[in-house]
Amino acid sequence: MSLTRLLIRDFRNIETADLALSPGFNFLVGANGSGKTSVLEAIYTLGHGRAFRSLQIGRVIRHEQEAFVLHGRLQGEERETAIGLTKDKQGDSKVRIDGTDGHKVAELAHLMPMQLITPEGFTLLNGGPKYRRAFLDWGCFHNEPGFFTAWSNLKRLLKQRNAALRQVTRYEQLRPWDKELIPLAEQISTWRAEYSAGIAADMADTCKQFLPEFSLTFSFQRGWEKETEYAEVLERNFERDRQLTYTAHGPHKADLRIRADGAPVEDTLSRGQLKLLMCALRLAQGEFLTRESGRRCLYLIDDFASELDDERRGLLASRLKATQSQVFVSAISAEHVIDMSDENSKMFTVEKGKITD
């Protein structure tokens, strides 16, 4: 599915824009601060309900306006879908699909699977475990229909359990929460383990092409001891959890450990190599989705040329073309992306929030 049309109103520095898009490559060229990243962020927000540069809604809505409005048209193999998102300064959202209100942001996320590659995206590799859990959970969300409901219930129960830890004195008082929590934790961990095992070969193959000088390994850590039932872990650690006032073990502590030649990648790879690895992982994830479900990702790439030499840019471009997916690329100069252009691509110029093609 590709985004054929995008309407933006009062988002960042963009007052209004109406863009007819290519199902292939779309290039956004402009100086720093022109608004090209804002276009990428508008697409991301339309599919996630939140921006990727700021969690503060006031910074995303254009100055002195009350709300932003985003609309898009998605073209699938058999039908077209109209989607819309409005969000005001109070953080209240309205999601519209095919003319009807009352939909959830998760429905937009399902309709628009996308991969984001930005200069800030290094957190996938050198940030905390939560960023790699998000990587795994993206895959589980798009591959397991029951994942989102289970994940939402897990978050709710963990919050309730942590609150209860401040009040209880005996483990038996926690059993009502743990009775619900344990099967959810085990199911989510199983889904994550299966997904990480399934995508491992894709990640290894793509990384070998991008970083042939390193031997990369991927290891899923579920968040508690191997070969130990989660129920046993919770009961055994009750006193420690009560002192900490939070649950110290579980799927909320899971990680995907990534190593290069046996060492953590953040300690081994240069910044340019980290970007290549990030690109490789995002590509592998998108290609795995296509193979498993027939669906294609949208790829959003901000500041394409940074950290990459000509050879590596060419490699990334060729791999993106091979996916036959829709790709949005921002760059300071058209020279950085001209080699990626073909007769089906579109080039947009962005200047002070104004977009022309």
Curated annotation (Swiss-Prot):
Q: Which UniProt keywords apply?
A: ATP-binding, Cytoplasm, DNA damage, DNA repair, DNA replication, DNA-binding, Nucleotide-binding, SOS response
Q: Would you tell me the Gene Ontology cellular component terms?
A: cytoplasm
What Pfam families is this protein classified in? SMC_N
By its UniProt entry, which PROSITE patterns does this protein fall under?
Answer: RECF_1, RECF_2
| GO MF, one example | ATP binding
Disulfide bond residue pairs:
none
Where does it mainly reside?
cytoplasm
Describe what happens without this gene.
Fails to resume DNA synthesis after arrest of DNA replication (upon UV treatment); arrested replication forks accumulate.
GO biological process assignments: DNA replication; DNA synthesis involved in DNA repair; double-strand break repair; recombinational repair; response to UV; SOS response
Record localization: Cytoplasm
User: In its keyword annotation, does this UniProt entry include Cytoplasm?
Assistant: yes
The residues listed in the UniProt record as binding ATP, with positions renumbered to this chain, are G30, A31, N32, G33, S34, G35, K36, T37
**Function (record text):** The RecF protein is involved in DNA metabolism; it is required for DNA replication and normal SOS inducibility. RecF binds preferentially to single-stranded, linear DNA. It also seems to bind ATP.
Annotated family: Belongs to the RecF family.
**What name is this protein filed under?**
DNA replication and repair protein RecF
Q: Which organism is it from?
A: Escherichia coli (strain K12)
